[in-house]
Amino acid sequence: MKRLILETLKAEVVPAIGCTEPIAVALACAKAREIAGVSIDEVDHVDVIVSPNVYKNGLAVGVPHTEHIGLAIAAALGLTGGKCHQGLQVLEGMKKTEQDIAVSLMDQGLISLDIKDTNEKVYIEVILSIQGWKAKVIIKERHNQFVYLEKQGHVLLDSKTVPGVIASHQNPLYHMEIKEIIAIIEQIPHEELAFMMDGVEMNKKMAMTGLQPGVGMGVGYTYYDNMKKGILSDDIMNQAMMLTAAASDARMSGSILPVMSSNGSGNNGITAILPIVAYGMKFQVEDEKMAKALAISHLMNSYIKHYIGRLSALCGCGVAAGTGASVAIAWLMGAKEQQIDGVIKNMLANVSGMICDGAKVGCALKLATSAQVAIQSALLAMDHHIVPTGNGIVAETAEGTIENLRILSEEGMQLTDHAILSVMMKFQRARESHIKDDVLTHEKYVV
């Protein structure tokens, strides 16, 4: 089981440049051009077809190397200068000329974007039309997982015929009790978990970028500025909120710096790491304990997202990554089994109603809230103040509460997700046609 934990962490905790949904689209486009083996001039048209959740998360977020937002510019950047061997850092090292060509391709209408009628959360299909023939790429389930490659009618890869890594829905880790996972992590030698520390400096650097005036919404900077003025206290909770929000401010506005992602999300990685970093800085936590705390946080994030989906109507930063951070912080405080159980109940009793309405600069507000609630939930649980069984969705155990969260996400939030997407598409159409509509009418969107 130790080996599976390490394999899962190495698969799910990886660097990413830019919001992972548009970056995954860029990755698919870069791969399509690679297998096609053609120059940009030879490409007649590009069709990008994505799941509703990928569309939602990529609609309003800044894309590195440009002042543009959305999936079309991400696709264009992937075509002109993307390096698919770099995975979710596909846009690293792009040249200015490649960026300019990408903007030109988008302006020319070379790229068409459509939504696929699918229940898949992560689904990206790219079709390059090249002088009478096509190249096709499909990414599914994970943002960097190619499941289908085709060139000129010849299938180069089909995941249905190739045995591979355990799919996330088959991972036995997610069917274990949480206390068992933590007990195994506690026994893993430090040298085998030392790679967890890679995300600390990476995500702190993004936070430092966001602490400059005028970055994103300025949520992190506002905390920092008011702490300097003495309006806010320089305590663990405000430090966690400041760092976490600042990193999101920078990332959502299109910073070219990488962050360490978690379970396919850079913002999840920020939330899973930086509240723990704030605690570690305040209490001088040694690297060995910090690495184990980070492993706990990332695995709790993946554990919960196994039940609610990688992308959903619920904000993964709040309900999954925030819960992971809270469990890890409580563990650093010396929490026992009952207190760990209580942390999860406290978190999900608090933030389970936080919706995901796409990636955007406003996410910094939700990340700040998630960091604050993570500290609060840990402190309450350490003092044995735990939401009682039967309060709302809170069950007798943490695992039962997570199962209730799954029911909320899968059965209760489908119409919510459709309504969110409907509203966002209305805004998008108004933006594209330069029409300002003061009253948004409800549209029915059926997946």
UniProtKB/Swiss-Prot annotation:
It comes from the Bacteria. InterPro entries: Ser_deHydtase-like_asu, UPF0597. One of its GO terms (molecular function) is L-cysteine desulfhydrase activity. One of its GO terms (biological process) is L-cysteine catabolic process to pyruvate. It holds the Pfam family SDH_alpha. Belongs to the UPF0597 family. PANTHER family: UPF0597 PROTEIN YHAM. This is UPF0597 protein Amet_4665. It comes from Alkaliphilus metalliredigens (strain QYMF).
